[in-house]
């Protein structure tokens, strides 16, 4: 499997096997983010969608997730909603 130096975990890890999003952002994620970090983002994204009851048809919700994704993957910020609790 191809390796990538992951911006989130600051180490060489397995790359995402496909470009996860279209366009330049998708290329950047594919080149700079590991599969481990991408899977962690997908789990975190699910928490955000459920806790904030986001409607993914709305542009505002999509923009919110895009901003949170950038924070999570490239800035190391992983903030869970206040009301969230692990079961």
Swiss-Prot record:
Iron among keywords: yes
SUPFAM superfamilies documented for this protein: YggX-like
GO biological process, one term: cellular response to oxidative stress
UniProt cross-references to NCBIfam families, sorted A to Z: PRK05408.1
Gene Ontology cellular component list: cytosol
This protein's name: Probable Fe(2+)-trafficking protein
Described function: Could be a mediator in iron transactions between iron acquisition and iron-requiring processes, such as synthesis and/or repair of Fe-S clusters in biosynthetic enzymes.
Pfam families according to UniProt: Iron_traffic
InterPro entries, alphabetized: Fe_traffick_prot_YggX, Fe_traffick_prot_YggX_sf
TM ranges: none
Annotated S-S bridges: none
Lineage: Bacteria, Pseudomonadati, Pseudomonadota, Gammaproteobacteria, Thiotrichales
Keywords, alphabetical: Iron
Family recorded in the similarity comment: Belongs to the Fe(2+)-trafficking protein family.
MF (Gene Ontology): iron ion binding
